[in-house]
C-alpha cells in the first residue's frame, strides 16, 4: 500500500504583470503625432525607442539605454509606447518591439529592430 505524504506546502500567488518603468533621466515620452513631427525638425541627433509595457526584450534594453544616454549627451533620446501612440508607430512603420528609429538633421535615417545593444550603439556613433 502506498501512502502519499506531501513534502512541502506552499501558497501559489498569481503573477503580477511587470510594467515598464523608466529610470532614464533625460528622456522624453512622445504622446502625439504633432509632437513627434516637431521633435524630428528640432533635433540634430535623435533616437526614438518604440516599446511596449508587456515586451520582455524592451525591458532587457533599459539598462543599455541608460548607459547610452549617459555616454552620448549630444543625442536626444525619446521613447514611444506603441500601445498608447499607435499613430506615431504607424508613421515610422514599426512592426516589432523594440524598434529604435534614428534621426539626424531633421530626417529619419535608420532603424534598428530588436534588442541589439551593439547595433544600437553603432547606429548612434554613426549619427
Swiss-Prot record:
Give the GO terms filed under biological process for this record: cellular response to oxidative stress
> Where do the catalytic residues lie?
55, 58
* Residues the UniProt record annotates as site (Contributes to redox potential value): 56-57
User: Which residues make up the annotated site Deprotonates C-terminal active site Cys?
Assistant: 49
Q: Per UniProt, what is one GO molecular function of this protein?
A: disulfide oxidoreductase activity
Superkingdom of this protein's organism: Eukaryota
The residues covered by the Thioredoxin domain are: 22-127
Q: Which Gene Ontology cellular component annotation is one that this UniProt entry carries?
A: mitochondrion
Kindly state which keywords UniProt assigns to this record, in alphabetical order. Disulfide bond, Electron transport, Mitochondrion, Redox-active center, Transit peptide, Transport
Enumerate the subcellular locations listed in this protein's record, separating them with semicolons: Mitochondrion
Quote the Pfam families the UniProt record gives: Thioredoxin
Transit peptide located at 1-21
All disulfide bonds of the chain are 55-58
List the InterPro entries.
Answer: Thioredoxin-like_sf (IPR036249), Thioredoxin_CS (IPR017937), Thioredoxin_domain (IPR013766), Thioredoxin_H-type-like (IPR050620)
Q: What family does this chain come from, according to its entry?
A: Belongs to the thioredoxin family.
Anything else of interest in the record?
Answer: Yeast has two cytoplasmic thioredoxins, TRX1 and TRX2, and one mitochondrial, TRX3. Present with 1010 molecules/cell in log phase SD medium.
Q: What is this protein called?
A: Thioredoxin-3, mitochondrial
